[in-house]
From Swiss-Prot:
One of its GO terms (biological process) is protein histidyl modification to diphthamide. Residues 6-77 form the J domain. InterPro entries: DnaJ_domain (IPR001623), DPH3/4-like (IPR044248), DPH_MB_dom (IPR007872), DPH_MB_sf (IPR036671), J_dom_sf (IPR036869). The keyword Cell cycle does not apply. GO terms for cellular component: cytoplasm; nucleus. The modification N-acetylserine is found at residue 2. Zn(2+) binds at residues 113, 116, 152, 155. This is Diphthamide biosynthesis protein 4.
Length: 172
């Protein structure tokens, strides 16, 4: 299923993704009435979005059934993830520093890009982590540690890398 450059069923029916079954049914009826060729003059036909009666019916068929709607929502989410969009609030994928490999010769962390699969698409030095730590005072530090934002060197994907420092204990 490809949703790239196409409208979702929610967009076709002009409803939010958390719409109730009653809202879906009402939107379906309104959309059919407002799109039906007998009810429209050519000047106000929905040609920009190219929404047809068949697309409206397909959208309703999927969204009105709880099981098919759940599967459709899962497919939408997977598609967005492939494009680098995740629903975690700020639009950034989050990874732990543990997900990265470390090159001891270069003192660099590396990871292949999860979107474009570019080998070593994400890489940054250990000194960059030190700078990040130095630039955050104790009041700004999140409870889960520190965060670094970094972009893939081959595509537009940005990642939020979560990390913490291990406190060295005296006498060891």
């Amino acid at each position: 299923m490809s949703l790239v450059n196409s409208l979702t069923h929610y967009e076709i029916l002009r409803i939010p993704s958390d719409a109730t079954q009653d809202e879906i049914k009402k939107a379906y009826r309104n959309r059919l009435l407002n799109t039906h060729p007998d009810k429209l003059s050519k000047s106000i036909h929905d040609t920009v979005s190219n929404v047809t009666i068949n697309k409206i019916q397909d959208a309703y068929k999927i969204l009105s059934n709880i099981k098919t709607r759940r599967e459709y929502d899962r497919l939408i989410l997977e598609n967005y993830k492939r494009q680098g969009f995740h629903n975690c609030g700020d639009g950034l994928d989050e990874f732990s520093l543990d997900d990265f490999s470390f090159d001891e010769d270069k003192l660099e962390f590396m990871m292949n890009c999860p979107r474009c699969q570019f080998v070593g698409g994400f890489h940054f030095s250990e000194s960059l982590l030190d700078e990040c730590i130095d630039n955050v005072d104790a009041m700004e530090r999140s409870h889960s540690g520190y965060q670094l934002l970094t972009q893939c060197s081959a595509c537009s994907l940005w990642l939020k890398v979560n990390f913490d420092i291990e406190e060295e204990q005296e006498g060891q």
